Amino acid sequence: MELWDKAERLWTRVKNWKTVRGWHIWKLKLVDARLYFVSMFVGLLTGLVAVPYHYLLYYLFHLRSGFFASHPAWYWHIPLFLFSWGILVFVMWLVGKMPLIGGGGIPQTRGVINGRITYRHPFIEMVSKFVGGILSFSAGLSLGREGPSVQIGSYVGSLVSRWTHILKGEQKQLLAAGAGAGLAAAFAAPLASSLIVIESIERFDAPKTAITTLLAGVVAGAVASMVFPVNPYHLIEVTEPVFAFFVQVKYFLILAVIVSVCGKFYSSTMNAFRHVYAKVNSPAYVKMFYLVLVAYIISLMQVNLTGGGEQFLLAQAQNGSTQIMWVTAVMLLHFVFSVFSVSSGLPGGSFIPTLVTGGLLGQIVGLVGVRYGVIGQENVSYIMLVSMSAFLVAVVRTPLTAIVLITEITGHFEVFYPSVVVGGLTYYFTELLQMKPSNVSLYEDMIHAPYFKEEKRYTLSVEIMTDSYLDGKLVDELSLPERCVIINVHRDGKNLVPAGTRLIPGDQVQIKMDSQDIEKLYEPLVSMA
């Protein structure tokens, strides 16, 4: 009899487990597994697009460098100058037709993920971004590869979400996965690629987002490692200076103050000049003429400063100059050139120019330390790497990404601890200086641009997670912000009437809200789901 009672209780548990919710949760696990496999596919496709993008930039830079290093006769410069000018005029025409391909790409990706922007023709725009970024770089401008790679990845994510007919609320997961894979392809840094999505694009730590971006980043990073087996940053030799703890903290504090002040100047100048440039009424071909002229003059002086200046930074970190004034002059020249290039709105990122400026600033600080006997010449590269990380924190305000990225691409874990300390102090000082992150400024400029057609009402899709705040709640019981309304609940391929519906994990909830509330409500609503 006792055995029969136990069997009956067990059967009751099985019946309770085999409820709609129980089966539904198991079904969701299968859906999640599918999403993770699809995100790896997104990473593979992104790698197959973004890595060739990186390779072509690398090839064209060395082709251009070889031309200027050969010191050709003066008449050979005329066709190259005119060709570069024509290239930029063509790219500006492309940007005029498709405004979303202009600039870096991180603000655009954020806008697509939070629902403010829609990629209407993702394949055409992706090809245009690819071609526009390569042509802008080949003209010698100081632009980076990371922003376009991130946006290319988001285009791939958008295309795959259409091909696979994935759920509406999961589309942003593939967009985020593609964006992370793009950065991984640009730097072969999968961990940092996941962090930048969380810190700068998604701006919210969701487990599913972290997993999808990490999986996609690992696959894209593997593709990048196959094409670029030797990471040039690994060739930088680092020797850590030996200090007593409190002496070390003192120098870290000084470096953080210097980086914070310079970062404030860097960001303010970039923002101010971008607005001034937009107000100049000269035709695009006139603006491009002066831009090519500046790029050409710098190419004649120091060709390694073109293309973002990454090659110049690597050369300085491995066997750099010891002349403080010369390095300072070059840093200022690179900064002015980067301001002109980034403000043009041509396809290309500002990530690498920012890293280069931070590295050269660190070299100056290191050389001053050598002159006064604080450190040895062999320690300068150590200061450069720490300064690169901190300067990225100051300008972009992504401390985790900056710290992990420098550690990951260089392979020098001895810079991790000082990067954490100096980066943390820099973050605090930039908050005191009331600095706005550069990507936030770019995003705000984008959504207020004349070409941006703003709708009055937008729809945000969120997926209900297990044990979240909204899990198990009746829609009628929810107290949402004013003019924020749930218009549809999608479950198991069916659209349910919101009134009277109890939310369960996996539900795709569509929320309509005013346009001015998207940025304010996106993070709270996603966190509730």
Predicted regions, residues:
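Short, compositionally biased
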Residues: L521-A529
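Cytosolic Rossmann-like ligand/nucleotide-binding regulatory domains
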Residues: T466, D471-D517, L521
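Alpha-helical transmembrane segments and immediately membrane-proximal extracytoplasmic
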Residues: M1-P450, K456, M465-T466, H490-G493, ...
